[in-house]
């Protein structure tokens, strides 16, 4: 089940991100999230803005993601390609799972597809697992974007 995250969920959300960071580091991608991303304050803001969601099964949180309708300034500039549409879109950020259940990513993405016909997502070039999952779920690679710290990300979009 997908639902909005609540402040009471924060310990479980932090645990999911800790597991995801460890998995990323062990699978050739230690720098995308480092040891502390996303920071707790960012997650609290996402919860307050009602843009952080959790995937639960039997009331246990196994996945988490931010879903943000509207323009994301990170995607204003793209190089080595272009967006396939200038239509309004929603963005998926910080998607992660605890690795205990299969299909969490697809379930979260399908929820987002139900909310918006045009989605954007990005990941680090070394995040092979995420790149595979993104493309497997119907997203098309569009080019390279740069996040707040100046590092590059591979950007994808989905059009219904």
Please annotate each region the language model reported.
Residues 1-15:
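A short beta-loop-alpha structural element at the N-terminal edge
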Residues 91, 114-126:
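Conserved GNAT acetyl-CoA-binding A-motif
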Residues 41-54, 71-73:
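A short helix-loop-beta-strand connector motif used in the catalytic cores of GNAT acetyltransferases and
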Residues 21-41:
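Conserved GNAT-fold acetyl-CoA-binding loop/helix
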Residues 97-114, 132-136:
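Conserved acetyl-CoA-binding loop-helix of GNAT-fold acetyltransferases
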Residues 106, 126-143, 148-151:
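Conserved active-site alpha-helix within GNAT-family acetyltransferase domains
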Residues 49-66:
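Conserved beta-hairpin
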Residues 66-100:
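Conserved acyl-donor/pantetheine-binding loop and adjacent beta-alpha core of acyl/acetyltransferases
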């Amino acid at each position: 089940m997908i639902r909005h995250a609540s402040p009471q969920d924060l310990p479980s959300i932090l645990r999911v991100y800790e597991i995801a960071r460890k998995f990323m580091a062990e699978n050739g991608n230690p720098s995308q999230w480092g040891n502390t991303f996303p920071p707790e304050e960012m997650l609290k803001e996402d919860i307050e803005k009602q843009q952080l969601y959790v995937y639960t099964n039997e009331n246990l949180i196994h996945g988490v993601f931010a879903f943000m309708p509207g323009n994301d300034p990170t995607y204003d500039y793209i190089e080595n390609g272009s967006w396939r549409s200038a239509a309004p879109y929603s963005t998926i950020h910080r998607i992660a799972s605890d690795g205990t259940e299969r299909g969490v990513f697809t379930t979260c993405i399908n929820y987002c597809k139900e909310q918006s016909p045009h989605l954007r997502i990005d990941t680090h070039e070394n995040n092979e697992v995420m790149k595979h999952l993104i493309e497997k779920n119907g997203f098309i690679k569009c080019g390279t974007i740069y996040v707040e710290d100046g590092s590059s990300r591979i950007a994808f979009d989905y059009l219904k």
